[in-house]
Structure formats: structure tokens, C-alpha cells
Design a protein with these regions (language model features):
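Stable alpha-helical elements in mature extracytoplasmic
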Residues: 77-81, 94, 100-103, 123, ...
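Solvent-exposed loop/turn segments at secondary-structure junctions
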Residues: 33-37, 98-102, 118-122, 132-134, ...
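Active-site His/acidic residue clusters
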Residues: 169-187
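Metal-dependent phosphoester-hydrolase catalytic domains
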Residues: 200-213, 219-320
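Structured beta-strand-rich core segments of catalytic domains in phosphoester-bond hydrolases
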Residues: 92, 97-173
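N-terminal, active-site-proximal structural segment of metallo-dependent hydrolase catalytic domains
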Residues: 19-107, 119, 294, 311-319
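Active-site beta-strand/loop signature of hydrolases that rely on acidic residues for catalysis
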Residues: 28-33, 63-71, 81-104, 155, ...
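Bacterial N-terminal signal peptides
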Residues: 8-16
Length: 320
């Protein structure tokens, strides 16, 4: 709770001390950093790591033993991630699987942060380049199913101005990438329970007539969902009217982050409201692939960033 209050105070300071001038264009990205925490945190948690066959116990401050043994990142690994963040050059990045601001700062030293306050080491949040006015919005705690999975984190850019836009960082339940949400699998049931929470947030922004985006790790191929109940058909129902959505990955070829990967479709997405999509720079959707040498030698992540560019004035429907 103290950490969350500090983040909110920092966002107020960032808003108060900024020039409030919106840049003409923003580069927005999402990146799951795969169990990213400071080396000191990982060392402290390793002795009491959780075995693979241990029963699942909600949110707690622990790491799986395979993570403790296989994802201990060296200074060189962290430096490679930092280089990749610099190459990405995004103004706003939705982050997943990051312990919090202290860890995120190792990769994004020139950014401010909004993060969820979940006790577990996997948190959602945002990195915001210094100088971009923002406020940390409320956490979407209901999305976590009583903190069994990850919370949503809201970010408000250019708050209190005609150019205000709202972003939600999500990391939905894994284990139901292509199955029906009506499947009897427990993971599909949990994902289905998250769906109305997400839809309520979308509908609330639409009813408030604010441009908005949902971005992050959906743990699901939204472009190839099976028939029946699905994430996309539920959230993209244009009810209310401003809840009509655009998947920025539509029509784009899939790329793996490195040669050793064999995935066949995106699960990381940037979803825009129809209003915000009016500012989408044509052909700006992309994926920042890992350099081959870093992919081979360094412990990067099983995800690499997905990004877009937005013309701010068009995205919010006001004159520049």
C-alpha cells in the first residue's frame, strides 16, 4: 500500500512539474519481461523457492524453483535488456511480469512508473518517459480474481486536459491460448471470469467518451479464437457505441522474437478504441526483435516488445 501511494505521489509530481504540452506523436509499446526482478530480490527468494509440483496458493512473495535456477540474470543480461529498451525508444510501455519500479528502473532509467501493488513478484504496470504528463489511475483489482492472478493497471496520459487518454496494462490468465472459454479446463474458466471485468472497464471508458487502449499479454491468440464465447467478440461489441475496438495486429504477419522460438501467433496486443485508432500511424505496428547475439547469449525474455505510433491530436479528436 505504501509503495502504491508513493507511485501515485510521483505521478502527481510528474504531472505538476511537466509542461503539459502533448507531443505530436507517441510511441506506445507493451513488453512482458518474464519474471523480471532485481538480482538481490531473486537471491533472497531462491532458498524458499516453490517446487513445480507444489499446490497452487494464491498471491505470495515467492518464485518457482525453475525460475530461480534458470532465470537468474547477470549484469550483462540486464545491460542487454536495457539496450533493447533503448532501441525500442518508446514513450510509454505497458509492462508485465515485473516486480515493481526498482526492477523496472534497471531497464528503463529515464522513465517514471505506475505499478500494481500485488505482493507477488509478477506485477503489471507502465513505464512513462520523463516529461510526458501522466497520473497513475486506479488498479483493476477485480481482474486478479482475489489476487490469484495479475491485476490491471490504469494509466492516464495528459490528465485533466482535452487530450486525456486512458491505457490499461493487462496480463490475463495463461493456459487457455486456443481452447474455448467454455472449456472445462480450470485455466479457461479463470480467463472467462476475467472477461466481464475487462469488458466493464472498456464500457466505462466508452461511456465517459475518453480515448482508450488495452495493451499487454492476453495469453491468447485473439486472431484465431475458436467459435463460441471468445474475448474479442465480447469486448468488441460496440455497446456502448464508443466501445468499438481496433486490434492493431490485424493484417500483420507474425514474427517470433528469436530464431529458437516456434510460436505461431501473437498473444501480446495493443487494442485501441475506434477514436484512438484515428491517430494510429499507418504501418507503424511492429515488433522489436532481439538481436541474434543477445538472443543466443543473454537471458532476455520469452516476449519481445510490440509497438505502434500514435498522432496525439487525431487520437483524441482535438486540434493539435
Amino acid at each position: 500500500m505504501k509503495n502504491r501511494a508513493a507511485l501515485f505521489a510521483a505521478s502527481l509530481l510528474a504531472f505538476a512539474t511537466s509542461s503539459h504540452a502533448a507531443p505530436a506523436e507517441l510511441k506506445i509499446a507493451t513488453w512482458n519481461l518474464e519474471w523480471f526482478m532485481t538480482p538481490e530480490t531473486l537471491r533472497a527468494l531462491t532458498p524458499a523457492c516453490t517446487p513445480a509440483d507444489a499446490p497452487r496458493i494464491g498471491a505470495r512473495r515467492s518464485v518457482p524453483c525453475d525460475v530461480a535456477q534458470g532465470l537468474a540474470r547477470s549484469r550483462e543480461d540486464i545491460a542487454a535488456l536495457k539496450r533493447h529498451a533503448r532501441a525500442l525508444g518508446a514513450d510509454v510501455i505497458a509492462l508485465q511480469e515485473v516486480d515493481g519500479p526498482e526492477a523496472a528502473r534497471l531497464v528503463f532509467p529515464d522513465h517514471e512508473f505506475c505499478f500494481s501493488g500485488r505482493i507477488a513478484v509478477q506485477n503489471n504496470g507502465f513505464a512513462i518517459r520523463r516529461g510526458v504528463p501522466f497520473l497513475c489511475g486506479p488498479e483493476l483489482t477485480d481482474l486478479s480474481l482475489n489476487d490469484d492472478v495479475r491485476r490491471g493497471v490504469e494509466l492516464r496520459l495528459f490528465p485533466g486536459t482535452a487530450k486525456e487518454m486512458r491505457l490499461l496494462s493487462v496480463h490475463l490468465k495463461s493456459g487457455c491460448a486456443r481452447d474455448s472459454l467454455e472449456s472445462t479446463r480450470a485455466s479457461c474458466g479463470e480467463l472467462a471470469r476475467q472477461l466481464p471485468v475487462l469488458e466493464r472497464w472498456i464500457d466505462a471508458q466508452a461511456a465517459d467518451h475518453k480515448p482508450f487502449a488495452v495493451l499487454g499479454d492476453f495469453n491468447r491468440d485473439l486472431r484465431r479464437e475458436p467459435a463460441g464465447l471468445s474475448i474479442w467478440t465480447e469486448i468488441d461489441d460496440a455497446d456502448p457505441p464508443d466501445a468499438d475496438l481496433v486490434n492493431t495486429a490485424d493484417g500483420k504477419a507474425f514474427q517470433n522474437c528469436m530464431n529458437s522460438q516456434t510460436f505461431s501467433g501473437y498473444i501480446d496486443y495493443i487494442i485501441l478504441s475506434r477514436q484512438m485508432a484515428r491517430g494510429l500511424v499507418r504501418d507503424s505496428f511492429g515488433r522489436e526483435l532481439f538481436p541474434p547475439k543477445d538472443a543466443q547469449r543473454r537471458k532476455m525474455s520469452d516476449h519481445c516488445p510490440v509497438f505502434i505510433r500514435l498522432r496525439v491530436a487525431d487520437a483524441v479528436g482535438v486540434a493539435g
